[in-house]
């Protein structure tokens, strides 16, 4: 993962050239912070929905078509990546004492 940057919040999207994007962590009510909070909530909701879909696919006796399985696994990988980034961002804020959750 990325190294913690003092006073900055890791955002749930990439910056230029695919590098981590940060914003100052001194205004949790600012526009960028609120947008990041909303995006993190949406990412976590999507991850939960994908997990439920995967569980349903595993619960049936007949295996799903390979293309359907591949699609769900790819989306699960995306969701896990997003979830890990949210966890990293929140962990960084906890260690600096600026966490809002």
Where do the protein language model's features map onto the residues?
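Hydrophobic alpha-helical segments that drive targeting, anchoring, or assembly
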Residues: 1-101
